[in-house]
Amino acid sequence: MKFGIHIGISQSYFDPKLISEIAYQAEISGWEGFFVTDSLYGSHESVPVCDPWVALSAIAVKTKKIKIGPMICAIPRRRPWKLARETVSLDILSEGRLILGVGLGSPAKEDFERFGEEPDNRKRADKLDESLEILVGLWSGKPFSYNGNIFKIQESTFLPKPVQTPRIPIWVAGEWPNKRPFRRAAMWDGVYPIYDTGNHEPGLTPQILETIMKDIKSRRALGGHFDVIVEGKTPSNDKSGSSDIIDAYHAAGATWWLEWIFPARGTLEQNLKRIREGPPTLK
């Protein structure tokens, strides 16, 4: 099992320099991944928000080995050919450390409808699926054309290719019990299940994860490694208590634990303290 940080880059975490320093502290403290939110406006008005690609670029320069990426990239409000350029550039800058977390993006009303973007989940899902096909085609470094219901691309060759082979890993987010996101996730490299409890904090239980894993396994035709990402909070200075929490998720099939580091969890100093204590360990 691997351990990373999932940080909300808004409110007191809006400065790319600060975010990159936190990522550096995570790396030297033993965490293996550092993932940032992708929010355009969010659910609160007049809150400072950082652009994820600027933050990730700063992180890539500041760190050496920690995996990085958006968690999750709201692909339906992006042009996939522009995203192809951005992701390859970041993969090169980070020397092959990028993981692309993808999903519909939320909240739909504030991050989409407010700015004249399509808020409907089904239509955004169609856009996401076509965008993923385009990304992989443009990452190939070979002549690629596309004729979808939404996007049309004349034959084009994008160079350079990503550092990673065969391509940049793709993790797909989905809110359980909706089934379409998990059908989508089974086609790619990992799943990031979300279970909304209504309080804006992680609510996925090991029991729910077991049910999700059965669903994923029934759909997954591809071989090879498949990541299962869960997030939550482990207590400070309590290795035994932390192990009790993550052991249950590991037994249910999780391959990554992401520590939830958001302003709602505590002050900057409190959250930095938890990061510097390092990741939890399995029993």
List each model region and its residues.
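Active-site-adjacent structural elements that line small-molecule/cofactor binding pockets in enzymes
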Residues: 1-283
